[in-house]
Each structure stands twice: as C-alpha cells, then as structure tokens.
Amino acid sequence: MDTWHDALGGEKQQPYFQEILNAVRQERLSGQIIYPPAADVFNAFRLTAFDRVKAVILGQDPYHGAGQAHGLAFSVRQGIRIPPSLLNIYKELETDIEGFSIPAHGCLTAWAEQGVLLLNTVLTVRAGQAHSHALLGWERFTDTVIRQLAAHRKHLVFMLWGGYAQQKRKLIDSQNHLILTAPHPSPLSAYRGFFGCRHFSQANSYLSRHGIDPINWKL
C-alpha cells in the first residue's frame, strides 16, 4: 500500500463519505461560508504522500476565521496573524530545537512537504462556528486515515495534544510507532505540560534511530 488512493479509495466510495461531501456542497451553495475553501479541504493529503509520512500532528477542526484555514492542522496562510496555539507550538520549538527561531508567519507547508501529516479530525467548519461540522461524519473518515497509516507504515511519530486527540491513541499500535502525548498547546492548557514536552526533538531521535531522515522543523 503506497498511496492515499490505495489506503482510502474504498472509503471514499462509501455512502457516508459521499453524504459528507454533499452536505458541505449544499451548505456552500446555500450561501454559507465554509472553511477551508473547497480546493483546500484535502490539502494535507495532497502535500504529504502516504508513503512519505514520517509524523502525524492531530488537530480538531479547522480555524473558523476568514482566510485562516487552508487544509493543514494548526497552520494558517502566509500573511495571516499567527494563532495563539501555533505561537505556543513555536515557543516550544524554540526551547526544544537548537537554532529554531520563531518565524513571522504561521504557514506549515514546509513541514507537510517533509512528511508531517497535519491532520484535523474534522475537515470543514462553518465561518465563525467552531465544531459546527463535528457531527457530519468526518471522524469516521479520519479515523480510517489513522488506522491505515498505523497498519501499513512502520516507525511513525504520532503527536496527540489534548484529551480529544488522545482518544485516537486506541487506533495506533504503540509497538510499531511512537505515540507522544501532551496537553493541548492552547493558552488555556499549554502551561500544564505542553511547554517542556520536547516532542519535536523526541520525534527526530526516534526517526534517526530507525534510519529515517529527521524533520527540519525550522520555517
């Protein structure tokens, strides 16, 4: 199994998946603003090929402010103000990775292109309404993504931040992969143990031990 088509082709034919796409399409047609734009919903898969995934960072649902979401968890487009959770991720990187300096932008495309799958468990959201698409069925699809990676790839790093992401731990075989958990990087919880978790250096140590090129976290 080498491609997303191999891993997810059957899933995308399932009635529930077609129903999700139809529901989102109907909302857009009715004039509801949905983020990210239709062309960006599956960006994480476009930028990070199945056979090149090294690490998975799990988010919840997309940013719901104008111009922010572009299909990569935690990331925003160039020119958009860095959201608080991402700024905390940068602060942790600054103390964890030698030579990392906080960039002036929040675009994580460079990570995605190196094999960091920035996966939201829900792939769309209504403008201004967090979790508004939580019940559409996206999680059935993204759970399959996690399962397929865990089953058909070896030595991946899964970063699960916050209780919601950590519920996905049960989908991953810890014998074959590294599972790193910490509180969410949001300002509400980062001080409870996200700061100091050193997930980024731990990920690179694990990858190197298994003969896999480490990730250049610098942006």
Curated annotation (Swiss-Prot):
GO terms for biological process: base-excision repair, AP site formation via deaminated base removal. The keyword DNA repair applies. Its EC number is 3.2.2.27. Its main location: cytoplasm. SMART domains: UDG (SM00986), UreE_C (SM00987). GO terms for molecular function: uracil DNA N-glycosylase activity. It is an enzyme of class 3 (hydrolase). GO terms for cellular component: cytoplasm. It holds the Pfam family UDG. The active site is at D61 (proton acceptor). Keywords: Cytoplasm, DNA damage, DNA repair, Hydrolase. Gene3D superfamilies: Uracil-DNA glycosylase-like domain. CDD domains: UDG-F1-like. It catalyses: Hydrolyzes single-stranded DNA or mismatched double-stranded DNA and polynucleotides, releasing free uracil. It is found in: Cytoplasm. HAMAP family: UDG. Belongs to the uracil-DNA glycosylase (UDG) superfamily. UNG family. PANTHER family: URACIL-DNA GLYCOSYLASE. Excises uracil residues from the DNA which can arise as a result of misincorporation of dUMP residues by DNA polymerase or due to deamination of cytosine. This is Uracil-DNA glycosylase. The gene is ung.
